[in-house]
Amino acid sequence: MPVNGIFDVFDMLSIYIIYKLIVSNNTWLIMRK
């Protein structure tokens, strides 16, 4: 059970980081125009 919880947290973190990277890349592309 604890291992599953740790993996859930890692999944949430990876999704959050990927989302942040995409958003920052999109804003950077918009600002460049």
From Swiss-Prot:
Outcome of gene disruption: No effect on iraD expression.
Signal peptide coordinates: none
GO cellular component, one term: plasma membrane
Membrane topology according to the record: Single-pass membrane protein
Keyword Ligase among UniProt keywords: no
Transmembrane segments: 10-29
Pfam families listed in its UniProt record: YtiC
Chief place of localization: membrane
Keyword terms: Cell inner membrane, Cell membrane, Membrane, Transmembrane, Transmembrane helix
Induction: Expressed at fairly high levels during late logarithmic and stationary growth (at protein level). Expressed at low levels in stationary phase (at protein level).
Cell compartment(s), UniProt: Cell inner membrane
Protein name per its UniProtKB record: Protein YtiC
Gene that this polypeptide is encoded by: ytiC
